[in-house]
Amino acid sequence: MTWRTTRTLLQPQKLDFNEFEILTSVIEGARIVGIGEGAHFVAEFSLARASLIRYLVERHEFNAIGLECGAIQASRLSEWLNSTAGAHELERFSDTLTFSVYGSVLIWLKSYLRESGRKLQLVGIDLPNTLNPRDDLAQLAEIIQLIDHLMKPHVDMLTHLLASIDGQSAVISSAKWGELETARQEKAISGVTRLKLRLASLAPVLKKHVNSDLFRKASDRIESIEYTLETLRIMKTFFDGTSLEGDTSVRDSYMAGVVDGMVRANPDVKIILLAHNNHLQKTPVSFSGELTAVPMGQHLAERVNYRAIAFTHLGPTVPEMHFPSPKSPLGFSVVTTPADAIREDSMEQYVIDACGTENSCLTLTDAPMEAKRMRSQSASVETKLSEAFDAIVCVTSAGKDSLVAL
């Protein structure tokens, strides 16, 4: 196993690129690189991500960043990124969840792009992370009026059926989905299916009369709504404790499709994915033997140009999502929680033995590893780490990001 310590990983403005040359063999030939995090809302992970973004952009010419949010959410963030609006105005272009997850990285990114003169494309590779279909429905209503006006009343009907699904997180939105009558849920799902099949059936005719970009956007919004409704159903059962093994894979399948489609359609794109380790890994996600999910990374692993870099830490605590939290607009609060114990067969113990505990450590999984577990949130994920990730970044602690007011 190849490894080295780094002193500047958490100093993106003063980065020593020589410390990152260990990653060159991993990144060469890649067009998709996932930069993970073992938990959301961690200050050190945001700093380390900023450093790796700099490295990938300046040394390997990556030109796009994908976020765990919907396309419309990302378009608003992109508007802010390319405007004269200051850091203090980011919340006006964002929602509470996206700001909490990505605020620190985005504020750094805006400053970096301004000072360096570089340009980066910002895209949403996910469903709306609120699982609120309102924005997708609104955009679809505008487009369908132009490309298939006979279906505009149908979209309006869907908007009415789903009007109460207006949460700011999956916790809230899935609960509101559960409050809908079963007949209303089924009518919404069948309504989206009808739209999808009609658009596909009429595609040769519709494409002759409308801008191809409009048709693609309509198809994209319908697909997003379809996956969102199924994910709402799944998350309701997940929070109720009645979901089936692997159910949450639906969202990961969607993300993989978006990324794969983008890279195939744009041969010059080289994209950095900022997502949780559990979405990026190239093996099934499991915490105690059961199948939790087939992650996005396992789908993307079928491409020879995908790489996954995980983040973990050695700290005694980690920010964790605590729910229910009725006073929070997201239905959960972020609480500093004891991290899972570092065990003999863990990645964290390997780092301690190899690199010590004083500095951050970069490790390539270029040889079989005895480590078969790694911290994830306040637990540990169990997998063959040398198959799951191409490299693993370990920082010494995991503190709550100062921008997170949850």
From Swiss-Prot:
The entry's keywords: Antibiotic resistance, Hydrolase, Plasmid, Serine esterase
GO molecular function terms attached to this record: carboxylic ester hydrolase activity
Pfam family membership, one: Erythro_esteras
EC number: 3.1.1.-
Gene3D superfamilies tied to this protein: Biosynthetic Protein domain, EreA-like (biosynthetic domain), EreA-like, domain 2
Source organism superkingdom: Bacteria
Protein's recorded name: Erythromycin esterase type I
GO BP terms in the entry: response to antibiotic
Further facts: Erythromycin esterase type I and type II share no significant homology except for the region from AA 270 to 300.
Annotated source species: Escherichia coli
Role summary: This enzyme confers resistance to erythromycin through inactivation by hydrolyzing the lactone ring of the antibiotic.
